[in-house]
Every structure is written in C-alpha cells, then in structure tokens.
Amino acid sequence: MSSTTAGLIFLAVLVAALVAVHVPLGDYMFRVYTTDRDLATERTIYRLIGVDARSEQTWGAYARGVLAFSSVSIIFLFVLQLVQGKLPLHLHDPATKMTPSLAWNTAVSFVTNTNWQAYSGETTQGHLVQMAGLAVQNFVSAAVGMAVAVALVRGFARRRTGELGNFWVDLVRGTLRILLPISIVGAVLLVAGGAIQNFHLHDQVVTTLGGTAQTIPGGPVASQEVIKELATNGGGFYNANSAHPFENPTAWTNWLEVFLILVIGFSLPRTFGRMVGNPKQGYAIASVMASLYLLSTGFMLWFQLQHHGTVPSAVGAAMEGVEQRFGVPDSGVFAAATTLTSTGAVDSAHDSLTSLGGMITMFNMQLGEVAPGGTGSGLYGMLVLAVITVFVAGLMVGRTPEYLGKKINPREIKLAASYFLVTPLIVLTGTAIAMALPGERAGMANSGPHGLSEVLYAFTSAANNNGSAFAGLSANTEWYNTALGLAMAFGRFLPIVLVLALAGSLARQGSTPDSAGTLPTHRPQFVGMVAGVTLIVVALTFLPMLALGPLAEGIH
C-alpha cells in the first residue's frame, strides 16, 4: 500500500470517527452545561472558593471572573518556574536558564491556551512544573474557552435577561466532567500505544534501531500528551513535540492524537444546536467547519505531495522534516488539524514544509482558527462570523439582519467587527516592528521571503493562541519573549471580552419571529455564505503579507 493511499484511509477513518461521536458527545456537553445537579466534588470546590452555584452573572461579572482567574494563574505559573530549583522533582542542571522574560512568556503562553515554547521542555522544566503548572493550565485554559463559548450560546438562547450563567460553575464542570474523563481514557490508550509515563528525573537508556544505546529524559509524558491534544494546547513535554517517539510512538497514536485535537471542536456545534433549541443550526455551523477543514487538508496534502525540487522528486514527496513512521500524508493531516485549531502541536517540522504548505498553516491560523478552532474559542469565533454574515446579507436585501431570533443592531455588529480586527492588528503590527529592528531581524535563520515568513508565523501563532512555530526563528530573547507574550495575552483576552459583551447584548433582547424576509440560517446557502465571508475577510487582511512571504518563496 502506498503512503498516499494509507494517508487517505487515515483521513477517511478520522472523519468517520468524528461523525460518529458528534451527536453523543455534543449531547453530553449540552447536559453538562444545562443541568442543575452538582457532583459532590463540585460542591466541595464551590464551598472552598466561596461560590454560590445557583447565582448567575452579567457579562461584565463573567468577564471579570475570566480575567481574575487567568491573572492569578499567570502569576502563580510565573513564580513556580522561577523557584522550581528549590522544589522537589526539579532538574539539577537545566540546559536553558529560566529568566524572568522566559518565565513570563511561558506563563502567558499556557494560561492563554497558546503553549508557545521558546525552550526545550525536557531540559528546562522539572516534573513538578510540568505537572502542577503546565498540565493544570492545559485543563483550565481550555475550560475557560468552553465556558466563554457556552456564555455566548446562552446569549442567543435567552430572552430579556442580563444573566449568562456562572463562570466558576462552567469552569469546574468543563474540567471535571468533560476534559478529565476523556483524558484518563486517552492517556491509557497512549500508554498502551507506547507513550511513556514515569517519574525518571534523569536520563533513561534506550536502544535505537541501530542497536546503540541512547539516554533520553523520561517523565509523566502520556498524561500531559493527551490533554495537550484534547484541549488544543500543543505544548510538548519534549522539544520535538509529537514527533518524539516517547510522545507519539506509532501511526496509531498519531491518528489518536489528531482525533483528540478535533473531537471537542467538532462536537460543540451539536451542543450549540441543542442549547438554542434547534439542532439544525448546529449542523449548519458544523458544516461550515467541516467544509473549511476538508478544503484546507486537501490543499495541504496536495502541496506536500508535489514533487518540486531535486530531493522531493527523488523520494516522491516533501520528506524533509517528516518522521518516516508517519509519512507525508499523515503529517499533512496533522499539520492542518493543529493549525485549524489552536493546538500548535507538531509531528513534523513546519519550517521544512513546502513554501505553499507553510502558507496553508499560516492561513489556517489567520482564519481565526474556526474549523473547528480551539476548545470553545472555535465555536464562539464561528458564531461571530455568522453574525457578520447575516449582517452582510441584510445589507444586500435592505433589512435589519437577524440571527436565531435576535436582531443584529449597530452595537452587535460593532462588537463582532472589533473581534475580527484584534488579531490582524496584533499580527501585522508585531511583524512590522520586528522586521524594522535590526537586532530582531538577526534572529531569523533565513533571509528573504522565508525569513519574513518565520516572523509572520510567530506573531500569527501567538496572536491566534496556536503556539506552533517555524523553528528557524531564535525567539528566546528579551524582546521576543516580551512582545510575543503581549501578543498572546491581547489575542486571547480582548476577543473574550468582546464575545461576552456581545452575549450580554443579545441576552437582553427579546425574540423576533421569523418572517418572509428572514434569512434561513440552517440551509446550505447560509453554510456557503459563512464559509465565503470567512475566506474573503482573511484574504483581504493578510494577502499582501502572504504575497511577500510564502507566495514569493513559492514562485521563486
């Protein structure tokens, strides 16, 4: 069987599995966020933090909860990294010194669900930091994203109220009832597939295929690997990330990791449909996500399987930076999934992708990561796009736009438009400043279009909370640590505040009955319109920069 055929089977089985779990997992998450029953563990947590689980919050109080929790998390993780040398399970001789700027960058990175890593995990962070710091944030940062998405859905579903739920309840439920159970099962499957799970502080000896001995650091890898993918975090225990055989040993575990990356994102539209009382609306949103996902994955495989250049022509594909145990097709599917979500994990070297393959990964992030996007953030990003789409459609027919019975008034469209201005402003401004500073240009391993692509990729990844990188950029400097940390923080929390403000504005409205002029938002026509608006918005915003970077490199 050729690698291309194997890759197509890999993709077909993946799609079939995602379709199979869409309804049951989506319905389960609907019950999690709508039930009035609390688990005993949850009631204990609420008592400890002084939360009344039955009280609800306005959008402002909900946003303050998100910001307060995230701020405390950043401070805790920042301090934990700086003092790890005095704590148990620390590395006695770390290869990279944890400076304040690197600790800031890493703390913001994991709290914002970005997991940008300007260091080698296995030689910089001790096991206690990995478990009590980074892995914990892998859970709760994703739970924050799901909570915000659910709050926006409540804004569409509720009528004439200022309340959107309780952030602390949504946070705890998302962590304990959704992320933790799936992670336990996934970790067992990864260990069964060959991923390691131990507490070896020092190097463990392994035998290579050539029969020689090699020493590699061990650690609690499988437990962190599963939540890294499931919660679309992406930060690896090892510098090689999911290309490392201790994290991702076989083609089977590679398939499982891609499935984990996509499963919650593609199931949340079902939750949305159930919560607004119309499952067809959820199918429409899922169809937009699926269309963009398959389109991107198809282009990625096409560009990576083209035989341009001497070496690719000789081996039949662009094999540079690709693990032979996965092959080009499987790695292409992984690369598309990890950049269409906010994951950023890699099983191949993205800096070694073909120029157009690298452009696809950047374009995926610049879409706003909505196909299916990050855990929670993909759904609320897609719903904001739906709001913009009905506004554009309303302009064409000359009537006030409506979505799910809610009028899209000037306030709502201003909030939606502002949401999609945040990330481009951060990406383009950050890239321009970096290219204007001689010292930061010196951090590029390549000159010309590919050098620009390295910097553009870094700010695109940071602002969209992805975390993957073109490895040719030396990012562990005071300037990049600070600038990318700010990009991650603003790229995460400004959109969240705007989404919650939009949810609050929608919740205060009554319901507008459908009329003959109401745009049906559950039909293929609307699916095509949302996909078209998404592609047009991104093309108009980023095409000039892409033309100077990967497109120019591809033409050359």
UniProtKB/Swiss-Prot annotation:
Bilayer topology term: Multi-pass membrane protein
Disulfide bonds: none
Source organism, top-level taxon: Bacteria
Membrane-crossing residue ranges in chain numbering: 6-26, 65-85, 133-153, 176-196, 249-269, 283-303, 378-398, 419-439, 483-503, 526-546
UniProt GO molecular function: P-type potassium transmembrane transporter activity; potassium ion binding
Keyword annotations from UniProtKB, A to Z: Cell membrane, Ion transport, Membrane, Potassium, Potassium transport, Transmembrane, Transmembrane helix, Transport
Compartments it resides in: Cell membrane
Recorded GO CC terms: plasma membrane
InterPro entries: KdpA
Family: Belongs to the KdpA family.
Cross-referenced NCBIfam families: kdpA (TIGR00680)
Matches recorded under HAMAP family: KdpA
Assembly mode: The system is composed of three essential subunits: KdpA, KdpB and KdpC.
Function: Part of the high-affinity ATP-driven potassium transport (or Kdp) system, which catalyzes the hydrolysis of ATP coupled with the electrogenic transport of potassium into the cytoplasm. This subunit binds the extracellular potassium ions and delivers the ions to the membrane domain of KdpB through an intramembrane tunnel.
Protein name: Potassium-transporting ATPase potassium-binding subunit
Organism of derivation: Mycolicibacterium paratuberculosis (strain ATCC BAA-968 / K-10)
